[in-house]
Amino acid sequence: MAVKRPTYAKDGFKSVSTRGCIIEFIATMTYVALCVPSQMKYGEGFSTAMVYGTVAALLTYAFRKETVVQMNPSVSVAFMATGKITVEQMVANVVSQLAGALIGVCWTCIWLTGSND
């Protein structure tokens, strides 16, 4: 008797990577938007703050997407084959997410503390 796969196994790569990237992108945009008032407090105009915020968010998203996509193919293969995920793959996936989050924090810190002469 064939083993019934879970439904999410069929689109393993999409269900892991795309959804994760979209969630991280929204989180990054929200994070940057919350930092715009801080940037304005240091004497920058709203449009300047928004430009910096958009650039930081897009660069952060690009880095995050790279880390997530690099780590996730092995995860999606495991999903498609068995519908299960090993501890090592789960750890690798979490590490890639954390790396993306750290990149986002670093970009925002540089953006807030950098001098704009």
What kind of feature is each model-predicted range?
Residues 1-117:
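Membrane-interface helix-loop junctions and terminal tails of multi-pass membrane proteins
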